[in-house]
Amino acid sequence: MSIITDFTNRRMYFWRGYYFGKEGIWCQDFDKEKAFCVLKDSLYKDYLVRAVADNGKTIAVSRNIGTNEPLLMVDVDKRTVINTIFNHTFIYPCLDREGSKVFSVTKSDIYKNIYGNPFCVDAQTGKVIATLDEKTQWGNNTAYHPESNSVYFSAFRQPNLYKFNFDTLTFSAVPTDKKIRIFDCKVACDNKGYYYLGSNILVYMNNEDKEVWRINFKEKEKLNGKTLFSICLSDHPDYIAVYLIDGEWLFIINRNDFSYKKYKLGRRVGFSEFLNNSLLLIDKNYNLSTLNLETLEEKPFLPPLA
C-alpha cells in the first residue's frame, strides 16, 4: 500500500505520482489546509513511504519491498534525505519513537527451508544492534506500539506473536490462543491495547498482553471457506474494520456492544487507515474516497495541494 496514516500527528503520507500523476512523496496534515511535498525530486518518483517515526519528524522510504534496495531516512520538516541505510532487506520496516532505529522482519519460507532473523539496525550507522534467532516463517506485518516504544510482529507457527522493545533491544513471545493462526496485528489508535486477527477470530489485548475480548466470526457468520485477512482502523477507537479476502466485504465492528455491520467494497483495489472516523478506499481507476465507519457514508477524496 502506497499510503501510510500517522494517527499520533494526524498526517497521511502518499505517493502522489501513483494516484494523481504528480511525482514525489506528499504529506496531508489534517491540522492544516493543504498537502505539501516532502520529496519532489524526480529521483524519488518510484519511492514509497515505508515507515513513520512517532515523533512525526522522520519517515523511511524505499523503492521496492523485499529487496536489498537502500532505505532512505527523510527529515519531514527539512524535506530532505538525512541518511541512507544499505545492505539490508527491509520487509515491513518499523521506526522507533525518535526515528533512530529500524526494525524489520525478513524473508522466510518454511516450505523452501528459507529462514531469516528479524533484526533492528541503528538508523545512523546501519549496524545491526539486535536479532532474533528463531527458525520459522514470519508474517507480513509489523505494528508499532507508542506506549511501550515496541513493535509487534507475527509468525506462522507457535509462538504466533512476538514483541520487540526498541529501548531494551529485547524480544519476547506474547501468549496468544494457540488455535489461532495470526494474519494481522494492529495497535489501537488510543494506544490502550492492540488487536490480532486469525482463523476468522478477532482478539483485543490490553497493554499488559492480556486478552480483553474476542469476536468469533466462525460462529457468527457462514463464510463458506473464506478468510478474514486484515484489520483496518480509523482514529476513532470504537470502530474496527476487518477485511474478508476474496469476498469484497468489510466487517465494521463497534467495540462498545460488539455489534457489526457489513459494507460491500465491490471492485476496489485497496483500502487504507485514515482519520476523521473513516477509511480510505481506492477503486480500480485509483480514485480515492472515504468511508465513515459509523454512518457508512462514502465521499470522494482528493488531498488539496499546497
Q: What is the meaning of each model-derived region?
A:
Residues 1-6, 44-52, 87-97, 134-145, ...:
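Repeated scaffold domains used in trafficking and secretory/extracellular systems
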Residues 11, 57-58, 101, 150, ...:
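Conserved core beta-strand positions within WD40 beta-propeller blades
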Residues 14-15, 60-61, 104-105, 153, ...:
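Residue position within the beta-strands of beta-propeller blades
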Residues 18-22, 64-69, 110-116, 154-158, ...:
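Short, solvent-exposed loop/turn segments at conserved positions within beta-propeller repeat blades
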Residues 24-26, 70-72, 117-119, 160-162, ...:
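A short loop-to-beta-strand structural motif that recurs across blades of beta-propeller domains
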Residues 29-33, 75-79, 122-126, 165-169, ...:
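Short loop/turn segments that connect beta-strands within beta-propeller blades
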Residues 34-41, 80-85, 127-133, 170-177, ...:
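A short beta-strand motif characteristic of beta-propeller blades
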Residues 270-306:
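Blade-level signature of beta-propeller repeat domains, shared across WD40, Kelch, NHL, RCC1
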